[in-house]
Amino acid sequence: HKSSRGLGDVYKRQVFIYTCIYTPLKPITPLSVFVGAIPGAIPFMLGWVAATNSFGIEPGTLFMIQFFWQFPHFWALGWMLDDDYKKAGFNMLPTGKKDKKTATQIILYIIWMIIISIFPYSGLTGALSLSIYGAIIVLILGILMLMFAVNLYNRMNTESARRLFLFTIFYLTSIQLVYIFDKFI
């Protein structure tokens, strides 16, 4: 099948980027997270393509949600485990700079993620759509995540980073469920 071959090709590229580019960059630059966000966002997209046998704005939107989600997720983790990453020889953001600049970057990526996450309500994302109820739930979840990030910005401590990190996991799981079950409301 042509679509299976295409999915396999994308998967091979994902594995290549992760193993041959992202992993070697980890001890070199904290910017490796940007490269790693690409293969990290591909599975979300591939799930759509595998289920529908089509590629378009829908999987692209899912890719972008997952792409932007990874930054607050991994930067909160990096904030919590900075010493461990240093011991392992990895340069992860915040790279010892648990400062307002890092917290501001987290906030900005969350804002972009919120915008992209509610975009399916616009009707411009093809079969990936949200009802007003689904959009409100996704928006509330995004605002809650933003509040955790603002708390990190204000307190600048590991506990705030931990709470943000845990909420990022809850957020991603929740919005995926909203996208699925919103169709039945």
For each feature predicted by the language model, list its residue ranges.
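Small-residue-rich segments of transmembrane alpha-helices in multi-pass membrane proteins
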Residues: F34-V49, K100, F165-L177
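Interfacial loop-to-transmembrane junctions
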Residues: L146-S174
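Membrane-interface helix caps and helix-loop-helix hairpins in membrane proteins
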Residues: T23-L31, W48-S54, T125-S129, T158
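Solvent-exposed interhelical
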Residues: F68-A127
